[in-house]
From Swiss-Prot:
This is NADH dehydrogenase [ubiquinone] 1 beta subcomplex subunit 2. The keyword Transport applies. Belongs to the complex I NDUFB2 subunit family. Accessory subunit of the mitochondrial membrane respiratory chain NADH dehydrogenase (Complex I), that is believed not to be involved in catalysis. Complex I functions in the transfer of electrons from NADH to the respiratory chain. The immediate electron acceptor for the enzyme is believed to be ubiquinone.
Length: 69
């Protein structure tokens, strides 16, 4: 199924898992970090709305339509 026997790897129950190249590891960790930063950023922005703590239209601060309180 796979390629030749080049490079190191770990064999378990007849299946050889080859070690990833360094750039694969670094790229994967970088993309993982970007993903978690994005998830946490969106959770900060949308969390109260998703949890039902406030409505999406509350607190936008735009009272320029003649609303005087």
């Amino acid at each position: 199924m796979g390629g030749g026997g080049h490079g190191g790897g770990i064999t378990y129950k007849g299946v050889t898992v080859h070690t990833p190249k360094t750039w694969h590891t670094v790229t994967g960790k970088g993309l993982c970090a970007v993903m978690w930063f994005w998830i946490l950023y969106r959770a900060k922005q949308d969390g109260p709305v998703v949890m039902g703590w406030r409505h999406p239209w509350d607190g936008h601060g735009d009272h320029g339509h003649g609303d005087h309180h």
